[in-house]
UniProtKB/Swiss-Prot annotation:
<keyword id="KW-0396">Initiation factor</keyword>
<comment type="similarity">
    <text>Belongs to the eIF-2B alpha/beta/delta subunits family.</text>
</comment>
<protein>
    <recommendedName>
        <fullName>Translation initiation factor eIF2B subunit beta</fullName>
    </recommendedName>
</protein>
<dbReference type="GO" id="GO:0006413">
    <property type="term" value="P:translational initiation"/>
</dbReference>
<dbReference type="InterPro" id="IPR000649">
    <property type="entry name" value="IF-2B-related"/>
</dbReference>
<dbReference type="InterPro" id="IPR037171">
    <property type="entry name" value="NagB/RpiA_transferase-like"/>
</dbReference>
<feature type="modified residue" description="Phosphoserine">
    <location>
        <position position="112"/>
    </location>
</feature>
<comment type="subunit">
    <text>Component of the translation initiation factor 2B (eIF2B) complex which is a heterodecamer of two sets of five different subunits: alpha, beta, gamma, delta and epsilon. Subunits alpha, beta and delta comprise a regulatory subcomplex and subunits epsilon and gamma comprise a catalytic subcomplex. Within the complex, the hexameric regulatory complex resides at the center, with the two heterodimeric catalytic subcomplexes bound on opposite sides.</text>
</comment>
<keyword id="KW-0648">Protein biosynthesis</keyword>
<dbReference type="GO" id="GO:0002183">
    <property type="term" value="P:cytoplasmic translational initiation"/>
</dbReference>
<dbReference type="GO" id="GO:0006417">
    <property type="term" value="P:regulation of translation"/>
</dbReference>
<dbReference type="GO" id="GO:0005851">
    <property type="term" value="C:eukaryotic translation initiation factor 2B complex"/>
</dbReference>
<keyword id="KW-0963">Cytoplasm</keyword>
<feature type="modified residue" description="Phosphoserine">
    <location>
        <position position="108"/>
    </location>
</feature>
<dbReference type="GO" id="GO:0005829">
    <property type="term" value="C:cytosol"/>
</dbReference>
<dbReference type="InterPro" id="IPR042529">
    <property type="entry name" value="IF_2B-like_C"/>
</dbReference>
<comment type="function">
    <text>Acts as a component of the translation initiation factor 2B (eIF2B) complex, which catalyzes the exchange of GDP for GTP on the eukaryotic initiation factor 2 (eIF2) complex gamma subunit. Its guanine nucleotide exchange factor activity is repressed when bound to eIF2 complex phosphorylated on the alpha subunit, thereby limiting the amount of methionyl-initiator methionine tRNA available to the ribosome and consequently global translation is repressed.</text>
</comment>
Length: 393
């Protein structure tokens, strides 16, 4: 299915593509929720006769959405979760059908031998004229509450997936997508309740940027712990957001101080723990996060200060940082140097990266909605969440 066909067939997909390109929808959480809602509509509108057809449709829609905004990794992550969901539900349905078939066959074989001997030889020939595969297929469909098909050719193989026939997976898949949406809605709640295990009284915590997950994490711990928070402003892209978050933390009763990025290294020796948010977690355990966060992580490593990252599993992406330039999004340089300075602007190339990359060796712990894990354990979570065949959409 081509990109043009996808956009014309599903108006919701076309609308989300426009929102992604115009940055009307941005940020990992908003993109993840919108992607899940759109995919729920796609599944409800799509007609398919095989699981392969459904998977191809979902992959085509996912590929189109990812190309619309490649730096929004959560879009592709939700697509991969839905593909994994489809495969798991299909395998579970086949397993149930196979068990029912075996039960029917074993019950028919347990009939009395005397009844079998009373059957004339010509009747045996007539009964055995129908292939066993037809009988088993009919039994399976009858058990599933669907009419028996006329011919066994309806159960032919397409790729590695049998035609689902009467197996209606639509409701199960839509229910699974709704579970993903519900999980996204309570991500911060699942993470913030773990704060009591990681934050202690009289500690000095340093954070950078304006992560809502980190803010919820700190505010929850402040209900029973007394600690101080230092917020690095993240000039120039996150300056306003950092000041706004610091104000909210202060209103929650937390001793909060805002510092410039230039003083991070000098103050790091007094910091007990660094807590960061992230835009995405890559396949190698590295982070795509706020610009300037690598400076914080490098300073923390020099002073042997632990770096903790708060993130939902939906930000975990199997993409590897082979090409950092394609991953790091650039922002307008006007925040660094005004366009009014025409003479200097015409003679200089100014880059303003919106995101920064932190290697996995600079991170000590990931706190997710599933619990706390070291970077070396992320591959296990990734294998449990995504299918290896969906790494590239």
């Amino acid at each position: 299915m081509s990109t043009i066909n996808v956009e014309h067939t599903y108006p919701a997909v076309s609308s989300l593509i426009a929102d992604l390109k115009s940055r009307k929808v941005q940020g990992p959480f908003a993109v993840a929720v919108e992607t899940a809602l759109v995919m729920r509509q796609v599944i409800s509108q799509t007609r398919w006769s095989t699981v392969d057809q459904l998977i191809d449709t979902v992959r085509a829609v996912g590929s189109t959405l990812v190309k619309a905004q490649p730096t929004e990794f959560s879009c592709g992550n939700i697509i991969r979760r839905i593909l994994r969901l489809i495969r798991e539900e299909y395998q579970e349905l086949l397993k149930t059908a196979d068990e029912n078939e075996k039960l029917i066959v074993s019950s028919s074989n347990s009939s009395s031998p005397s009844q079998k001997r009373d059957i004339p030889s010509n009747e045996k020939l007539v009964q055995s004229h129908e292939p066993v595969s037809v009988q088993m297929y009919s039994s399976m469909l009858n058990l599933l509450g669907r009419p028996t098909l006329e011919s066994p050719t309806h159960s032919k193989t397409v790729g590695d997936s049998r035609v689902t026939g009467g197996m209606d997976m639509r409701a199960v898949i839509i229910s699974g997508i709704q579970d993903v949406i519900d999980e996204l809605d309570k991500i911060n709640t699942d993470i913030e309740v773990q704060s009591m295990d990681h934050l202690h009284s009289n500690e000095i915590i340093l954070t950078q940027g304006c992560s809502k997950t980190v803010e919820a994490f700190l505010r929850f711990a402040a209900k029973k712990r007394k600690f101080s928070v230092i917020v690095a402003e993240g000039f120039p892209n996150n300056q306003k957001g950092s000041h706004a978050m610091a104000k909210r933390l202060a209103q929650a009763g937390i001793d909060t101080t805002v510092i410039s990025d230039a003083t991070i290294f000098a103050i790091m020796s007094r910091v007990n723990k660094v807590i960061l948010g992230t835009h995405a977690i890559l396949g190698n355990g590295g982070l795509v996060t706020y610009s300037g966060a690598q400076l914080v992580a490098q300073a923390a490593r020099h002073h042997a200060t632990p770096v903790v990252v708060c993130s939902g599993i939906y930000k975990l992406s199997p993409v590897y940082p082979y090409d950092l330039e394609s991953i790091i999004q650039l922002s307008s340089p006007d925040k660094i140097m005004s366009f009014n300075e025409g003479d200097l602007i015409s003679r200089a190339e100014i880059l303003n990266p919106y995101y920064d990359y932190i290697p996995p060796d600079l991170v000590d712990l990931f706190i997710t909605n599933l619990g706390g894990y070291p970077p070396s354990y992320l591959y296990r979570i990734m294998n449990d969440t995504y299918d290896a065949s969906d790494t590239i959409l």
